[in-house]
From Swiss-Prot:
A motif (PPXY motif) lies at residues 118-121. This is Gag polyprotein. GO terms for biological process: viral translational frameshifting. It comes from Human T-cell leukemia virus 1 (isolate Melanesia mel5 subtype C). A lipid is attached at G2 (N-myristoyl glycine). Keywords: Capsid protein, Disulfide bond, Host-virus interaction, Lipoprotein, Metal-binding, Myristate, Phosphoprotein, Repeat, Ubl conjugation, Viral nucleoprotein, Virion, Zinc, Zinc-finger.
Length: 429
């Protein structure tokens, strides 16, 4: 019997180990744009491909979905190829911003590039997270929250600060799948965030709603009541989605955890691989920085300053102290911690004492090295002999009977009154 993969009931499938959360959320965003929608089998196949691709992480620095698609085996089952095509199209649609050329001097030629000076950093063209886009297969009516759905969402954002990229992208995915009303969003906010965060979000949302009502929104009727009331109508899909965008935008004004940078104390261990250390930094910044804060300069700075001394020497020697993250990872890719040889510290042996040993009375050795056995503290309690211990007492040893001589035992088997026959040449027998 083959394994049956139903449609995914969990709003946020678990990411494979070793993949950053914001990268996994990009794959989910692309998967939910497919028509028909993804199933659990598609997510299972996607995780299998990513686990194999993570063994050669050259496509991640920076992330290159075209290179990842080339690693996909031909005729791979599931909708993995379609998911990668959506990511490739989204990546190519974003225009790149080329760096301005350096000013040229007409008098002299530019000097040769110094290998010790790192090249200028070029911003990656790939977006950190994909924007929310509702797929064509959105149901006409929304799905109300269930307790298992709220618990799954809260588990995903438990380690992320409100307003961080991981928090926002997780909420975007939940909004995209369930298409909640204003009442559902309020319930979600109260379930996920504290009362202080909910109060700050409510204030920011009120100001955004007032501005939107003044500006005018497609489908909004001022005579039908406030925008919050009209967004509760399940039939008003367009107006409800406008309210969802305002509700998500209100998180941008929340104070993130960047004031207390716990990620600044993340240091590379003496024997920790460099790519593992960079991945820990990446995850910590995703969970701590507010949305919109540039992460790459902070990540590159910490990837050098918080590395161990051996990796810092490698980066300095190759001029990658402020280079793109991919160059830094390649510089320390072949680094392995040095084998720490254990030095055996031999304690010098003390010279023999001049005093006589208290056991045998001879000089030249310590009492612990004396060949004479230790004398008993008193007489034996069994036989009162002061020359041996109780364990050596002959009374404790069982008496072994002496074996009888073999000749006597043989003689006992012979009869005593049988005459010995006499043989003679002419006589009687």
């Amino acid at each position: 019997m083959g394994q049956i993969f139903p449609r995914s009931a969990n709003p946020i499938p678990r990411p494979p180990r070793g993949l950053a959360t914001h990268h996994w959320l990009n794959f989910l965003q692309a998967a939910y744009r497919l028509e028909p929608g993804p199933s659990s089998y598609d997510f299972h196949q996607l995780k299998t491909v990513l686990k194999m691709a993570l063994e050669t992480p050259v496509w991640m620095c920076p992330i290159n979905y075209s290179l990842l698609a080339s690693l996909l085996p031909k005729g791979y089952p599931g909708q993995v190829n379609e998911i990668l095509q959506v990511l490739i199209q989204t990546q190519t649609q974003i225009p790149s911003h080329p760096a301005p050329p350096p000013p040229s001097s007409p008098t002299h030629d530019p000097p040769d590039s110094d290998p010790q000076i790192p090249p200028p950093y070029v911003e990656p063209t790939a977006p950190q997270v994909l924007p929310v886009m509702h797929p064509h297969g959105v149901p006409p009516t929304h799905r109300p929250w269930q307790m298992k759905d709220l618990q799954a969402i809260k588990q995903e954002v438990s380690q992320a600060a409100p307003g961080s990229p991981q928090f926002m992208q997780t909420i975007r995915l939940a909004v995209q799948q369930f298409d909640p009303t204003a009442k559902d969003l309020q319930d979600l906010l109260q379930y996920l965030c504290s009362s202080l965060v909910a109060s700050l979000h409510h204030q920011q949302l009120d100001s955004l709603i007032s501005e939107a009502e003044t500006r005018g929104i497609t489908g909004y009727n001022p005579l039908a009541g406030p925008l919050r009331v009209q967004a509760n109508n399940p039939q008003q899909q367009g107006l409800r989605r406008e309210y969802q965008q305002l509700w998500l935008t209100a998180f941008a004004a929340l104070p993130g955890s960047a004031k207390d940078p716990s990620w600044a104390s993340i240091l590379q261990g003496l024997e920790e691989p460099y790519h593992t250390f960079v991945e820990r930094l990446n995850v910590a910044l995703d969970n701590g920085l507010p949305e919109g804060t540039p992460k790459d300069p902070i990540l590159r700075s910490l990837a050098y300053s918080n590395a161990n001394k051996e990796c810092q020497k490698l980066l300095q020697a190759r001029g990658h102290t402020n280079s793109p993250l991919g160059d830094m990872l390649r510089a320390c890719q072949a680094w392995t911690p040095r084998d720490k040889t254990k030095v055996l510290v031999v304690q010098p042996k003390k010279p023999p004492p001049n005093q006589p040993c208290f056991r045998c009375g001879k000089a030249g050795h310590w009492s612990r090295d004396c060949a004479q056995p230790r004398p008993p503290p008193g007489p034996c309690p069994l036989c009162q002999d002061p020359t041996h211990w109780k364990r050596d007492c002959p009374r404790l040893k069982p008496a072994i009977p002496e074996p009888e001589p073999e000749e006597d035992a043989l003689l006992l088997d012979l009869p005593a009154d049988i005459p010995h026959p006499k043989n003679s040449i002419g006589g009687e027998v």
